[in-house]
Amino acid sequence: MAGMGFSNVGLGIVHSMVHQLGAVYDTPHGIANAIILPTVMRFNGEVCADRFREILINIGRPDAKDLNDQDVINTFVWKIQELSKAVGVTQTVKDTGCKEEDLEMLAEKAMADACRPGNPREVTKEDFINLYRQAM
């Protein structure tokens, strides 16, 4: 059932980025997703704040309707990071073995990844480099 959803809407740049971490550093897919998701949420938040607000309201934060977009993004990202920390997931791309000198190669591969077109916001190679760097 999840696959049907993926094929209808795409997966976006979280998966474009984590596929590279798995391929290059043998990082488990779920761990890589947990590391990359908060950074990409901040990036996509510029065009997804209303969706984030709706999710926050539905997970018990009715006050989210009164928050400005930046506070919605920050609150949602914080919730995701807290969950990740609570279950003991590593928090940085550095923990996968990634080094600064690898970022351009990872970004090139992420640009070519089939999941990229499903992202709600356009992304460039430079964006990918910056996103990986922010996740370090």
Residue spans for each PLM region:
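Gly/Pro-rich interdomain helix-loop hinge
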Residues: 24-102
